[in-house]
């Protein structure tokens, strides 16, 4: 507990304006410091993983912290989304905005040629939705619900009555549908190491062969990124890039973060416990009342 410094005499009138300007500048710097990048994270088809190249990493400006979404909505139907700051209730995606921003960078033009006109980066995108079987879809929903069963969050494929601050998971299609040319990408999510309000995440089920377990675990990873979880360097954890690992879950163990090599986690922490981190963010699932 620190002592309060002694009160100083009021500054002269001319100094008040200087001090006020200084306070405003400091406040703006504090706000700027609170703004962090959202790193798009990718998962590769049929369980194959790779570390994103520096050129594949996009950073999107967003202010945190936010309250965690209590509903994970798995959307199997065709879906239209627009680029912008994440707002799942309105179908607005920061990931799409980042992809569009990258595509809008002018390409080098050879002498004597005319540059191609750029498409409107604000245009919406239409995703095809789930093209697997109904049985496979029901298995995906059950699998995702089991992954998040320990936590106080609802997993559903029925449109929620209240769309405010849900995790919208667009399931289906391929990365090219979003404008991503790398066919190895299986999922995309916004990430900055903290909770993202009303996020939209993507799981390219067709690129993953509509394989139930792979789609399920990809959903788990991408949703967990929106709750602030980093990649974990543990083969049995949902957050891993490692393979082959068999069936994965959120593991109650302190592990190093990393993709193909161990590293510190986002924010500088040496380890991450994916199970306890989700418990911290969402809380435990309430016990069912006794009959």
Regions found by a protein language model. Name each.
Residues 32-48:
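Hydrophobic single-pass membrane-insertion segments
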Residues 54-72:
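Short amphipathic alpha-helices and their capping/turn segments at secondary-structure boundaries
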Residues 2-15:
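Juxtamembrane low-complexity tails/linkers enriched in Ser/Thr-Pro and polybasic
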Residues 59-64, 77-163:
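Zn2+-dependent metallopeptidase catalytic core
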Residues 69-82, 168-169:
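Short hydrophobic beta-strand segments
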Residues 12-29:
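N-terminal Sec-pathway targeting helices
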Residues 77, 131-234, 244-247:
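Metzincin-family zinc-dependent endopeptidase catalytic domain
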């Amino acid at each position: 507990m620190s002592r309060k410094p002694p009160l100083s005499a009021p500054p002269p009138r001319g100094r008040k304006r200087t001090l006020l300007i200084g306070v405003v500048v400091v406040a703006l710097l504090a706000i700027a410091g609170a703004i962090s990048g959202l790193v798009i994270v990718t998962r590769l088809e049929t369980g194959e993983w790779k570390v994103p190249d520096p050129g594949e990493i996009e950073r999107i400006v967003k202010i945190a912290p936010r309250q965690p979404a209590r509903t994970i909505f798995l959307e199997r139907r065709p879906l239209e989304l627009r680029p912008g700051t994440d707002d799942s209730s309105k179908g607005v995606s920061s990931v799409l905005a980042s992809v569009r921003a990258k595509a809008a960078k002018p390409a080098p033009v050879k002498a004597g040629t005319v540059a191609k006109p750029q498409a409107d980066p604000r245009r919406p995108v239409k995703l095809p939705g789930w093209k697997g079987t109904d049985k496979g879809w029901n298995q995906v929903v059950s699998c995702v619900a089991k992954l998040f069963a320990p936590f106080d969050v609802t997993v559903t494929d029925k449109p929620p009555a209240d769309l405010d601050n849900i995790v919208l998971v667009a399931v289906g299609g391929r990365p090219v549908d979003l404008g991503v040319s790398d066919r190895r990408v299986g999922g995309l999510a916004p990430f900055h190491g903290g909770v993202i309000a009303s996020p939209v995440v993507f799981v390219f089920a067709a690129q993953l062969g509509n394989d139930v377990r792979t789609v399920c675990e990809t959903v788990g990873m991408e949703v967990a990124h929106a709750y602030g979880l980093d990649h974990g360097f543990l083969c049995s954890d949902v957050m891993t890039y490692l393979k082959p690992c068999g069936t994965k879950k959120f593991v109650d163990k302190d592990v190093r973060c990393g993709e193909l090599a161990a590293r510190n986690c986002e924010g500088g922490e040496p380890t991450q416990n994916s199970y306890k981190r989700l418990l911290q963010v969402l809380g435990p699932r309430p016990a069912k009342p006794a009959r």
